[in-house]
UniProtKB/Swiss-Prot annotation:
<feature type="compositionally biased region" description="Pro residues">
    <location>
        <begin position="794"/>
        <end position="804"/>
    </location>
</feature>
<dbReference type="InterPro" id="IPR048287">
    <property type="entry name" value="TSPN-like_N"/>
</dbReference>
<feature type="compositionally biased region" description="Low complexity">
    <location>
        <begin position="368"/>
        <end position="383"/>
    </location>
</feature>
<comment type="similarity">
    <text>Belongs to the fibril-associated collagens with interrupted helices (FACIT) family.</text>
</comment>
<feature type="domain" description="Collagen-like 9">
    <location>
        <begin position="790"/>
        <end position="847"/>
    </location>
</feature>
<feature type="domain" description="Collagen-like 3">
    <location>
        <begin position="358"/>
        <end position="403"/>
    </location>
</feature>
<dbReference type="GO" id="GO:0005576">
    <property type="term" value="C:extracellular region"/>
</dbReference>
<feature type="binding site">
    <location>
        <position position="213"/>
    </location>
    <ligand>
        <name>Zn(2+)</name>
    </ligand>
</feature>
<feature type="compositionally biased region" description="Basic and acidic residues">
    <location>
        <begin position="833"/>
        <end position="845"/>
    </location>
</feature>
<keyword id="KW-0176">Collagen</keyword>
<dbReference type="GO" id="GO:0051216">
    <property type="term" value="P:cartilage development"/>
</dbReference>
<feature type="domain" description="Collagen-like 6">
    <location>
        <begin position="604"/>
        <end position="656"/>
    </location>
</feature>
<feature type="domain" description="Collagen-like 1">
    <location>
        <begin position="269"/>
        <end position="325"/>
    </location>
</feature>
<dbReference type="GO" id="GO:0060349">
    <property type="term" value="P:bone morphogenesis"/>
</dbReference>
<keyword id="KW-0732">Signal</keyword>
<feature type="domain" description="Collagen-like 8">
    <location>
        <begin position="712"/>
        <end position="755"/>
    </location>
</feature>
<feature type="region of interest" description="Triple-helical region (COL2)">
    <location>
        <begin position="418"/>
        <end position="756"/>
    </location>
</feature>
Amino acid sequence: MKNFWKISVFFCVCSCLGPWVSATLKRRARFPANSISNGGSELCPKIRIGQDDLPGFDLISQFQIEKAASRRTIQRVVGSTALQVAYKLGSNVDFRIPTRHLYPSGLPEEYSFLTTFRMTGSTLEKHWNIWQIQDSAGREQVGVKINGQTKSVAFSYKGLDGSLQTAAFLNLPSLFDSRWHKLMIGVERTSATLFIDCIRIESLPIKPRGQIDADGFAVLGKLVDNPQVSVPFELQWMLIHCDPLRPRRETCHELPIRITTSQTTDERGPPGEQGPPGPPGPPGVPGIDGIDGDRGPKGPPGPPGPPGDPGKPGAPGKPGTPGADGLTGPDGSPGSVGPRGQKGEPGVPGSRGFPGRGIPGPPGPPGTTGLPGELGRVGPIGDPGKRGPPGPPGPPGPSGTIGFHDGDPLCPNSCPPGRSGYPGLPGMRGHKGAKGEIGEPGRQGHKGEEGDQGELGEVGAQGPPGPQGLRGITGIVGDKGEKGARGFDGEPGPQGIPGAAGDQGQRGPPGETGPKGDRGIQGSRGIPGSPGPKGDTGLPGVDGRDGIPGMPGTKGEAGKPGPPGDVGLQGLPGVPGIPGAKGVAGEKGNTGAPGKPGQLGSSGKPGQQGPPGEVGPRGPRGLPGSRGPVGPEGSPGIPGKLGSVGSPGLPGLPGPPGLPGMKGDRGVFGEPGPKGEQGASGEEGEAGARGDLGDMGQPGPKGSVGNPGEPGLRGPEGIRGLPGVEGPRGPPGPRGMQGEQGATGLPGIQGPPGRAPTDQHIKQVCMRVVQEHFVEMAASLKRPDTGASGLPGRPGPPGPPGPPGENGFPGQMGIRGLPGIKGPPGALGLRGPKGDLGEKGERGPPGRGPKGLPGAIGLPGDPGPASYGKNGRDGEQGPPGVAGIPGVPGPPGPPGPPGFCEPASCTLQSGQRAFSKGPDK
């Protein structure tokens, strides 16, 4: 089967929490605020002071007071005139915003503070901050204080030395009369000037100011003595403007007319004749965002729409849950030799394979010593062989390992009996005896000479993660996320084009001309007049801001199935299936003639190594055999250290495999062996389960509503994605039928001897084996016909070998002992004769292999039924229309009544919403 790179590195997606602001009630309800940072190093641009296009920052928008009113957290009230709206801030509300979201680089050196407000009740006698910036410890850095006890206003600021400086404006009784007032402070480099109701009160010198700490909060309406307590007052307008001279140009037309006792009024005369049309008025300002409408009823299912354009590739989805096992794919041709893998852990022993039988071939290169296999079943008693001559004394055997004893940490209570010790070193080779008759399989004999190459060792466990693979195929577009919370206002943008003129007001009836009266005493300021006739088309207005995204509509009913799409590209290979159950072994047939090479069979699991047979005499060297069919992929060899990549040599003719050699002692854990050959890809697996819902994305820009489309043509295949996370390792399946014998691969580079395991590692391995096989060993100890073996003693010095005795009866199978320490790799044995070609096995059931790569993106699904959501907010203002043809000038009329226009609200603010002195009702 085809091998895939495995990767075990997970990519974590950190979702960033957006900035937060709060307006907390006594139950601590929070209101988010909008950031006004322009992203630069300073809050205000360095351009000529005195222009109305300098940016300003509406604190009512920043503190989300309008949204709080729509939630009925605070109350909307009538403002200074019937055309104005104000907000009544009670003592149960706490408006505060992190300073870093408003002024990340601090306040500018020069600016102005403007507000229209009214105090009532007990607030007239309190000492409180209408606006204040605190540091992280709650200490004041900048603020405007109103003192009802001393009838004064104070501007506080942080000096260069960090101390709090104050400029106090005294004797202001007219401010504390429960009426609407407009308070403005122009902060310049060396002075602070107070304006009340557009009248300049006083200018006081101030010292150089220090930089504020942006880690604190900006608050509204707090007591000076207890900054945690809010003060009730009514707020219509509050603005921070980059022009310190803005208060000098402000008007107070929105304030009610004040009639004093020192003024007299005359009767108002009749209206004059209609005056001529006035000059074009200034461009109107965008209106405030409307309140979200209620969700509409669920609409009926819509008809299937036309095919839509192919969607853009979606972001990679989260790793899905492991899919079901797929069917075993067809066997592929052998791949090129891959790079040497990392060191693997010992794998689960495989079942024993069927012995092969082939034409004897030339001796192969010496093979590495295999890992010790389990004890095989005792065979029937063989015929007695001829007695050979006594051999010479063998050399002393190595000392055995110290056995466990009761009380040892590995077996604190009682140690299980150990297995028989490993055989000693081979003795000197005796004289060649007469050839005996072929006997039945006998019990295990003395350890013979170094055998031929043994069977492949156990499959190692998964190694460490390999290098990062290629980028994965783009995942399917995820479901639409829920509506996110409204973010902060964006940064101030460039100055937009002027807006279109407002709607024409109703023309008033012309009045009759009255008799000219005597000149009277100058009257008080008149009330605003009716709007004049429509002027010429003004310049285009500023584009309005995007509205808040509407609530998602209810899920519609499923639409009708669309027409079948085009045939897609071939899918990626699926997950290998689970191996099938072991078939019933057939009767042994007669040896047939060598057959033609068959088709490549599926790879079977490595079998358990059987007990070594008696070493027979070496036969004459046979002729080279014909090239056999490619066999199944072998198990990983003894790992060696990663060697340098050598130049590939010319492939030699593969020789037949040698006879299995005697199992050697278990060697130490070696370095990783070379990577096996790459197999063919498997069949496409079943679709995996749907992944978890992704994190909520940021709200996207408002788009136009399009017609639902039918599935489009399949797009090109995306970039290959990262390999998925490897699923949990399944249990070993039953042994499959033996595959055809494959050609022996080129011998790998001989690695250096492995490092000896540490004592701690040996104890861990022994403890794990004891825990896994303790039940089995305990059951074996209870057999009535077998006595429990004692603890292994220290081996004594070997005596001279005696003459071989008669073959005795086979003994019972011993208790499976603890695995020994892995011995050093043995020398490669001679290549044995090639076995007979076995019959091709039936196709096994689905195997279970590593998780395959994600499948290609499927075709777009059928469009869902149309549904009616909530009424959305008004769309953005369209582009200005083409100016019309100028009309014929009319005859001049008499002067009309005074018009009403609020210069502050008619001013264009770059990148900001309209800074009117209060939203219209």
